[in-house]
Protein backbone atom coordinates (compact mmCIF):
# COMPACT_ATOMS: atom_id res chain seq x y z
CA UNK A 1 0.00 0.00 0.00
CA UNK A 2 1.25 3.49 -0.76
CA UNK A 3 0.88 5.95 2.08
CA UNK A 4 1.31 9.64 1.35
CA UNK A 5 4.06 10.17 3.94
CA UNK A 6 5.50 6.70 4.70
CA UNK A 7 8.02 4.51 2.84
CA UNK A 8 8.08 0.92 4.15
CA UNK A 9 11.16 -0.06 6.12
CA UNK A 10 13.50 -2.20 4.08
CA UNK A 11 12.56 -0.70 0.72
CA UNK A 12 14.37 2.65 0.87
CA UNK A 13 17.62 1.13 -0.45
CA UNK A 14 15.79 -0.43 -3.40
CA UNK A 15 14.23 2.91 -4.26
CA UNK A 16 17.63 4.61 -3.83
CA UNK A 17 19.28 2.11 -6.22
CA UNK A 18 16.55 2.60 -8.81
CA UNK A 19 16.82 6.38 -8.44
CA UNK A 20 20.61 6.16 -8.93
CA UNK A 21 20.04 4.26 -12.18
CA UNK A 22 17.55 6.87 -13.36
CA UNK A 23 19.98 9.65 -12.42
CA UNK A 24 22.43 8.03 -14.87
CA UNK A 25 19.83 8.16 -17.63
CA UNK A 26 18.45 4.61 -17.40
CA UNK A 27 14.70 4.50 -17.97
CA UNK A 28 12.89 2.37 -15.38
CA UNK A 29 9.46 1.04 -16.32
CA UNK A 30 6.90 -0.33 -13.90
CA UNK A 31 3.87 -2.54 -14.42
CA UNK A 32 1.38 -2.67 -11.59
CA UNK A 33 0.85 -6.28 -10.54
CA UNK A 34 -1.37 -8.11 -8.09
CA UNK A 35 0.91 -7.16 -5.17
CA UNK A 36 1.05 -3.52 -6.28
CA UNK A 37 -2.65 -2.73 -6.62
CA UNK A 38 -2.49 0.24 -4.28
CA UNK A 39 0.48 2.06 -5.73
CA UNK A 40 -0.52 5.49 -6.87
CA UNK A 41 2.03 8.22 -7.69
CA UNK A 42 5.18 7.55 -5.64
CA UNK A 43 6.97 5.62 -8.38
CA UNK A 44 6.25 8.41 -10.85
CA UNK A 45 7.61 10.93 -8.31
CA UNK A 46 10.83 8.90 -8.26
CA UNK A 47 10.98 9.10 -12.05
CA UNK A 48 9.73 5.66 -13.03
CA UNK A 49 7.52 5.28 -16.06
CA UNK A 50 4.32 3.43 -15.22
CA UNK A 51 2.91 1.36 -18.05
CA UNK A 52 -0.56 -0.06 -18.38
CA UNK A 53 -0.69 -3.67 -19.45
CA UNK A 54 -0.57 -4.99 -22.00
CA UNK A 55 1.99 -2.59 -23.48
CA UNK A 56 2.94 -2.94 -27.12
CA UNK A 57 6.41 -1.69 -27.98
CA UNK A 58 8.83 -2.06 -30.83
CA UNK A 59 12.41 -2.95 -29.95
CA UNK A 60 15.00 -3.74 -32.61
CA UNK A 61 12.36 -4.11 -35.31
CA UNK A 62 10.37 -6.66 -33.29
CA UNK A 63 7.00 -6.07 -31.63
CA UNK A 64 6.75 -6.98 -27.96
CA UNK A 65 3.62 -7.33 -25.86
CA UNK A 66 4.77 -6.85 -22.28
CA UNK A 67 2.94 -6.80 -18.99
CA UNK A 68 2.78 -8.11 -15.47
CA UNK A 69 0.11 -10.58 -16.49
CA UNK A 70 -2.31 -10.37 -13.58
CA UNK A 71 -5.91 -10.19 -14.78
CA UNK A 72 -5.17 -10.80 -18.46
CA UNK A 73 -7.18 -13.55 -20.06
CA UNK A 74 -10.17 -15.40 -18.64
CA UNK A 75 -10.15 -14.99 -14.85
CA UNK A 76 -12.08 -17.27 -12.44
CA UNK A 77 -15.10 -15.68 -10.74
CA UNK A 78 -13.60 -15.87 -7.23
CA UNK A 79 -10.44 -14.09 -8.32
CA UNK A 80 -12.49 -11.46 -10.21
CA UNK A 81 -14.40 -10.78 -6.98
CA UNK A 82 -11.16 -10.47 -4.99
CA UNK A 83 -9.65 -8.13 -7.61
CA UNK A 84 -12.82 -6.04 -7.48
CA UNK A 85 -12.46 -5.69 -3.73
CA UNK A 86 -8.81 -4.64 -4.01
CA UNK A 87 -9.67 -2.06 -6.69
CA UNK A 88 -12.62 -0.63 -4.74
CA UNK A 89 -11.97 3.04 -3.79
CA UNK A 90 -14.03 2.85 -0.59
CA UNK A 91 -12.10 -0.19 0.66
CA UNK A 92 -8.82 1.49 -0.31
CA UNK A 93 -9.79 4.56 1.71
CA UNK A 94 -10.76 2.45 4.73
CA UNK A 95 -7.45 0.57 4.51
CA UNK A 96 -5.58 3.89 4.41
CA UNK A 97 -6.99 4.68 7.86
CA UNK A 98 -5.01 1.78 9.35
CA UNK A 99 -1.66 2.58 10.92
CA UNK A 100 1.15 1.55 8.51
CA UNK A 101 2.49 -0.97 11.05
CA UNK A 102 -0.85 -2.80 11.01
CA UNK A 103 -1.43 -2.43 7.27
CA UNK A 104 1.98 -3.78 6.24
CA UNK A 105 1.72 -6.71 8.64
CA UNK A 106 -1.70 -7.58 7.20
CA UNK A 107 -0.47 -7.27 3.61
CA UNK A 108 2.75 -9.22 4.16
CA UNK A 109 0.92 -11.89 6.14
CA UNK A 110 -1.69 -12.28 3.41
CA UNK A 111 0.96 -12.50 0.69
CA UNK A 112 3.22 -14.90 2.58
CA UNK A 113 0.28 -17.09 3.63
CA UNK A 114 -0.97 -17.30 0.07
CA UNK A 115 2.45 -18.44 -1.24
CA UNK A 116 3.15 -20.85 1.61
CA UNK A 117 -0.28 -22.48 1.38
CA UNK A 118 0.70 -24.04 -1.97
CA UNK A 119 3.90 -25.71 -0.62
CA UNK A 120 5.25 -26.10 -4.15
CA UNK A 121 6.31 -24.18 -7.23
CA UNK A 122 3.57 -23.05 -9.57
CA UNK A 123 3.12 -25.40 -12.53
CA UNK A 124 2.19 -23.53 -15.69
CA UNK A 125 -0.81 -25.18 -17.40
CA UNK A 126 0.37 -24.59 -20.97
CA UNK A 127 -2.29 -23.77 -23.53
CA UNK A 128 -5.06 -23.91 -20.91
CA UNK A 129 -3.43 -21.12 -18.86
CA UNK A 130 -5.49 -17.87 -18.94
CA UNK A 131 -2.43 -15.76 -19.80
CA UNK A 132 -1.59 -18.01 -22.75
CA UNK A 133 -5.22 -17.81 -23.90
CA UNK A 134 -4.95 -14.03 -23.68
CA UNK A 135 -1.85 -14.06 -25.92
CA UNK A 136 -3.49 -16.40 -28.45
CA UNK A 137 -6.51 -14.06 -28.73
CA UNK A 138 -4.44 -10.86 -28.66
CA UNK A 139 -2.25 -11.89 -31.59
CA UNK A 140 -5.37 -12.33 -33.75
CA UNK A 141 -5.79 -8.53 -33.64
CA UNK A 142 -2.17 -7.35 -33.27
CA UNK A 143 1.06 -8.44 -34.90
CA UNK A 144 3.30 -9.55 -32.02
CA UNK A 145 6.70 -11.24 -32.18
CA UNK A 146 7.21 -11.75 -28.45
CA UNK A 147 4.96 -11.88 -25.38
CA UNK A 148 6.73 -11.27 -22.05
CA UNK A 149 4.90 -11.51 -18.74
CA UNK A 150 5.58 -12.17 -15.07
CA UNK A 151 2.91 -12.88 -12.45
CA UNK A 152 3.28 -16.67 -12.27
CA UNK A 153 6.82 -16.69 -10.80
CA UNK A 154 7.86 -19.57 -13.04
CA UNK A 155 9.85 -19.91 -16.25
CA UNK A 156 7.92 -20.56 -19.45
CA UNK A 157 9.13 -20.46 -23.05
CA UNK A 158 6.70 -21.62 -25.71
CA UNK A 159 5.15 -20.56 -29.01
CA UNK A 160 1.69 -19.13 -29.53
CA UNK A 161 -0.60 -20.44 -32.29
CA UNK A 162 0.47 -17.47 -34.44
CA UNK A 163 4.17 -18.25 -33.98
CA UNK A 164 5.12 -15.57 -31.44
CA UNK A 165 7.35 -16.50 -28.53
CA UNK A 166 5.60 -16.57 -25.18
CA UNK A 167 7.80 -15.99 -22.11
CA UNK A 168 6.90 -15.86 -18.44
Positions of PLM-derived features:
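Active-site-proximal loop/helix segment associated with metal-binding centers of metalloenzymes
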Residues: 69-130
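Conserved beta-sheet core of the metallophosphoesterase superfamily
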Residues: 46-53, 63-65, 70, 75-82, ...
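Short C-terminal domain-edge/linker segments immediately following a structured domain
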Residues: 20-25, 59-63, 94-101
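A broad, low-specificity signal for short, low-complexity segments enriched in glycine/proline
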Residues: 13-14, 22-30, 106-110, 125-130, ...
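Short, surface-exposed linear patches
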Residues: 12-15, 51-53, 73, 86-90, ...
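Core catalytic region of metal-dependent phosphoesterases/phosphodiesterases
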Residues: 1-59
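Membrane-proximal helix-turn-helix segments that form the acceptor-binding/catalytic region
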Residues: 19, 113, 134
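Short, charge-rich amphipathic segments
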Residues: 12-23, 67-76, 116
Amino acid sequence: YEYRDVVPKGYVRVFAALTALMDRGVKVYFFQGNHDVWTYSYFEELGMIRLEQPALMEIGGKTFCIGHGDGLGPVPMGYRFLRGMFHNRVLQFLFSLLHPWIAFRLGNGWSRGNRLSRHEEYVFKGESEPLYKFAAEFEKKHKVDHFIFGHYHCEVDMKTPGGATFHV
